[in-house]
């Protein structure tokens, strides 16, 4: 197996396998962790550059970042409320921006097409282990984000309603029913509470698998479109031309899907938070 550069312009062989790039104390550094660090550093540098010389009348990159932040804030405030958005906005906005940039970073030429593999011909290369792997196409990364959010969800929920309020919300009789009827409904609502506990435990799994599955499926879709000429048995020069032109419409589709998946992940997190922290007497 040799280190090779794929001739195609994009992803060529998405893999579950990880490439460990570090040695010694950096042995834990994988291709997806490296990409996550690059994306995080890039976002920080862009944000720093946009806010270095801020003015009352924004322009250029400052205007773009302010529009993004204000739009996210207004959207999340409409879901979690004025009080909770002050606590949760930093995390939810960070998740949205990181997932969005990571999804779009995966579409850059060289991500997934440079790595270790075997060269089959001048135009076709089988990359078995890519040097750069999209972080959101790594289940470890998506699961880590989901688990960390659920931890903060539990912290914020207990801060808002307390342990007693949390248990009442999970297992208590709903609708203000009291007396004999309320007593008879206790076993039913306790069973419903157990089902709710199970659903909460599966939330990080569903969040992580949904994001991972869509991003990974997008990689495979682009791979199929790139290699379709070869798979159909076209001449090598036709297959090479098809590998460049056929995937173009799907690039725009993946740009849209990358945005939608970032929105879905963030909005689901906001909805989970709103459901557990909303007070009936408050206006949300």
Where are these regions (language model features)?
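Selective transmembrane helix interface/packing segments
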Residues: 1-284
């Amino acid at each position: 197996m040799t280190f090779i550069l794929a001739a195609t312009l994009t992803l060529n062989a998405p893999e579950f396998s990880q490439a460990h790039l570090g040695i010694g104390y950096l042995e834990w550094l994988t291709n997806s962790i490296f990409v996550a660090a690059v994306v995080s550093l890039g976002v920080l540098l862009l944000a720093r550059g946009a806010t270095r010389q801020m003015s009352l009348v924004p322009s250029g990159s400052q205007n773009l970042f302010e529009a993004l932040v204000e739009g996210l804030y207004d959207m999340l405030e409409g879901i979690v409320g004025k009080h909770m958005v002050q606590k949760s906005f930093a995390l939810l906005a960070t998740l949205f921006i990181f997932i969005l940039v990571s999804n779009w970073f995966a579409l850059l030429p060289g991500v997934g097409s440079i790595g270790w593999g075997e060269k089959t011909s001048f135009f076709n290369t089988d990359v078995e282990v890519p040097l750069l792997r999209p972080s959101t196409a790594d289940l470890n990364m998506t699961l880590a984000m989901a688990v960390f959010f659920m931890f903060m969800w539990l912290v914020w929920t207990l801060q808002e309603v307390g342990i007693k309020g949390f248990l009442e919300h999970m297992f208590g009789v709903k609708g203000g029913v009291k007396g004999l009827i309320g007593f008879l409904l206790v076993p039913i609502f306790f069973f419903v509470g157990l089902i709710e506990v199970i659903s909460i435990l599966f939330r990080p799994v569903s969040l992580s698998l949904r994001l991972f599955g869509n991003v990974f499926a997008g990689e495979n879709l682009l791979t199929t479109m790139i290699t379709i000429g070869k798979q159909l048995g076209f001449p090598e020069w036709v297959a090479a031309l098809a590998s460049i032109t056929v995937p173009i419409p799907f690039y725009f589709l993946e740009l849209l899907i990358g945005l939608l998946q970032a929105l879905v992940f963030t909005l689901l997190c906001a909805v989970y938070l709103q459901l557990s922290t909303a007070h009936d007497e408050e206006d949300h």
